């Protein structure tokens, strides 16, 4: 390793250490202060994503305690979303005009079977679900299987594409009741990040299973990609 490489490595380590020292691990933050802290502590050269982790007091193994849904983020995600629409030929032009990146039927199914998944969201009309069932085992684990509860199995192709492109985020509680999602880029204004945070947290709170006993919201953590993590003061959540 050259002297230059050593200097760069030392400099990088110093930046990481200094950035992390700005965040106090034993402090609870409200959302506004948390966003400000994460921005000041970010040291990476790329535009990191603001990430949220929510710990819920549920047991997803029970069917009546599944927490899942979608949220339209007011300020978007900052990502370019590729949308595939599986529909009959007579609706393909409508899907293309609405902004779909990939449109078709059996051609898309064949690509999926071949391992070619070049989309982030898959939308389908109800009459195509029997065909899509043949690739459910491929799409399901990737979170790409169209679902009427998430608005991705619909006759309203135009609106579904609009929602997906404008910043619709899916959430689902995994094992131990953990929800994880990216809610925008750290370069967003504080106001836009707070709008996204409030929309997402509000949606998860509204999704509380009926009849659930005990505390539903156990903990919330915010972090940025490769950055420090801060814990949110739950009493500050309205």
From Swiss-Prot:
Gene Ontology CC, one term: large ribosomal subunit
Keyword terms, alphabetized: Repressor, Ribonucleoprotein, Ribosomal protein, RNA-binding, rRNA-binding, Translation regulation, tRNA-binding
InterPro entries recorded: Ribosom_uL1_bac-type, Ribosomal_uL1, Ribosomal_uL1-like, Ribosomal_uL1/biogenesis, Ribosomal_uL1_3-a/b-sand, Ribosomal_uL1_CS
GO molecular function, one term: tRNA binding
Domain of life: Bacteria
Single GO biological process annotation from the record: translation
PROSITE patterns recorded: RIBOSOMAL_L1
Keyword Transmembrane: no
Signal peptide: none
Pfam families: Ribosomal_L1
Family to which the UniProt record says this protein belongs: Belongs to the universal ribosomal protein uL1 family.
SUBUNIT field: Part of the 50S ribosomal subunit.
Function: Binds directly to 23S rRNA. The L1 stalk is quite mobile in the ribosome, and is involved in E site tRNA release.
The protein, known as: Large ribosomal subunit protein uL1
Organism of derivation: Rickettsia prowazekii (strain Madrid E)
Encoding gene, per UniProt annotation: rplA
């Amino acid at each position: 390793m050259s002297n230059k490489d050593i200097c760069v490595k030392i400099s990088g380590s110093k930046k990481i250490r200094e950035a992390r020292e700005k965040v106090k691990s034993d402090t609870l933050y409200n959302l506004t202060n948390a966003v400000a802290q994460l921005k000041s502590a970010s040291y990476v050269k790329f535009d990191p994503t603001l990430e949220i982790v929510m710990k819920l007091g549920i047991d997803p193994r029970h069917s009546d305690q599944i927490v899942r849904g979608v949220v339209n983020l007011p300020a978007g995600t900052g990502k370019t979303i590729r949308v595939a629409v599986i529909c009959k030929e007579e609706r393909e032009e409508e899907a293309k005009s609405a902004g779909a990146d990939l449109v078709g039927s059996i051609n898309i199914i064949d690509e999926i079977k071949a391992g070619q998944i070049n989309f982030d969201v898959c939308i389908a009309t109800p009459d195509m679900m029997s065909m899509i069932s043949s690739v459910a085992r491929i799409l399901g684990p990737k979170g790409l299987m169209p679902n009427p509860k998430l608005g991705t199995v619909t006759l309203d192709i135009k609106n579904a594409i609009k929602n997906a492109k404008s910043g619709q985020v899916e959430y689902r509680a995994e094992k131990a009741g953990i929800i994880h999602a990216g809610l925008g880029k750290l370069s967003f204004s504080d106001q836009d990040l707070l709008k996204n945070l409030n929309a997402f947290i509000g949606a998860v709170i509204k999704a509380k299973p009926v009849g659930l006993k005990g505390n539903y919201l156990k903990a919330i953590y915010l972090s940025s990609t490769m950055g420090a993590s801060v814990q949110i003061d739950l009493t500050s959540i309205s």
